């Protein structure tokens, strides 16, 4: 399982490649949500 976003890694302390939330999205509650 790959972390879907950077904050997921920070929260769980896992080592994996982050897929950051991009334009129009923000990180909230460990998920990408529309801004």
Curated annotation (Swiss-Prot):
Pfam families: Toxin_20. GO terms for cellular component: extracellular region; host cell postsynaptic membrane. The keyword Iron-sulfur does not apply. Blocks neuromuscular transmission. Acts cooperatively to potentiate the activity of huwentoxin-I. Paralyzes locusts and kills mice following intracerebroventricular injection. The keyword Secreted applies. It comes from the Eukaryota. It is found in: Secreted. Expressed by the venom gland. GO terms for molecular function: toxin activity. Coiled coil: none annotated. Belongs to the neurotoxin 12 (Hwtx-2) family. 02 (Hwtx-2) subfamily. Disulfide bonds join 3-16, 7-27, 21-32. Keywords: Disulfide bond, Neurotoxin, Postsynaptic neurotoxin, Secreted, Toxin. This is U1-theraphotoxin-Hs1f.
């Amino acid at each position: 399982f790959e972390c879907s976003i950077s904050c997921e890694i920070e929260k769980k302390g896992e080592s994996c490649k982050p897929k950051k939330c991009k334009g129009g999205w923000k990180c909230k509650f460990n998920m990408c949500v529309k801004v």
